[in-house]
């Protein structure tokens, strides 16, 4: 029942071309073992069972084709400001929005100011006071609608990036589904762990990311000093260098995790 609830939650995210394909049912032709859903957090289940689009074409926010063929595309909304780190922000915010846990939707801007959606819904907005950003109440409202949520995300995606995620999210020595690999910088890069499998005691991970210009969240692969990539799943063994889309991540140093997994 828990899995079904999470899957339904993911499936109703606003987008087009909804299909029954999910991250979890990507075909693996070699002997990687699927991990059980038992013991996974709600957040891990949400990502693992997130729906994929029927098409593997990658498009930008305006519908222009970026890539004719890919490993797969996550079935979620894309806006004009949704790049790189914003893909992780989108998934994390959607997770709590559909659970109506609005107080858990909160991100810190690059300047360090935390902006909760629960405050935004009550009419608070980011304002500059001297040389400092603050949250100030500018209107009397109680608006948790999808349209207001999207307006909130537009601001968050504009002022939150790889540098602030690298700074603000906790480190983790043990990567899990839903965790991030983060190169904080201007620009930096962020990739999301969307699935995990095992073979002979080694953990293999599948990743996704977005890019510039703002575009679909695409399933991606790469190489690892931890061993051979198997059917697009990348091994991580202790201190490992992973290369994806030309970016080099070091584990565990670049692993970031989210608080509130359930």
Model-derived features: positions:
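Extracellular-facing segments of soluble proteins and assemblies that are Gly/Ser/Thr-biased and enriched
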Residues: 81-170
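Low-complexity, Gly/Ser/Thr/Pro-rich intrinsically disordered linker/tail segments
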Residues: 206-262
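Substrate-binding/catalytic groove segments of enzymes
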Residues: 97-101, 190, 199-203, 215-218
């Amino acid at each position: 029942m828990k899995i079904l609830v999470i899957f339904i939650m993911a499936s109703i995210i606003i987008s087009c071309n909804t299909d029954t394909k999910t991250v979890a049912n990507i075909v693996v032709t070699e002997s990687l073992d699927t991990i059980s859903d038992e013991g996974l957090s709600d957040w891990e289940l949400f990502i693992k069972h997130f729906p994929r689009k029927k098409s593997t074409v990658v498009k930008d926010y305006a519908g222009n084709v970026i890539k004719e063929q890919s490993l797969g595309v996550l079935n979620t909304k894309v806006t004009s400001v949704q790049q790189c780190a914003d893909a992780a922000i989108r998934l994390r915010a959607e997770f709590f929005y559909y659970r109506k846990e609005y107080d858990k939707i909160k991100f810190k801007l690059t300047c360090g100011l935390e902006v909760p959606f629960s405050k935004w819904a009550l009419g608070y907005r980011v304002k500059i006071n001297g040389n400092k950003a603050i949250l100030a109440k500018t209107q009397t409202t109680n608006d948790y609608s999808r349209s207001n949520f999207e307006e909130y995300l537009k601001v968050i995606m504009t002022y939150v990036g790889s540098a602030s995620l690298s700074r603000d999210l906790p480190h983790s020595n043990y990567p899990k589904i839903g965790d991030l690999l983060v190169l904080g910088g201007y620009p930096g890069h962020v990739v999301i762990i969307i699935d995990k499998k095992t073979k002979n005691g080694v953990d293999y991970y599948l990743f996704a990311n977005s890019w510039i210009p703002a575009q679909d969240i695409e399933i991606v692969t790469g190489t690892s000093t931890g061993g051979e990539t198997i059917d697009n799943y990348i091994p991580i063994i202790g201190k490992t260098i992973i290369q994806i889309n030309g970016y080099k991540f070091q584990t565990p140093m670049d692993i970031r995790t989210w608080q509130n997994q359930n």
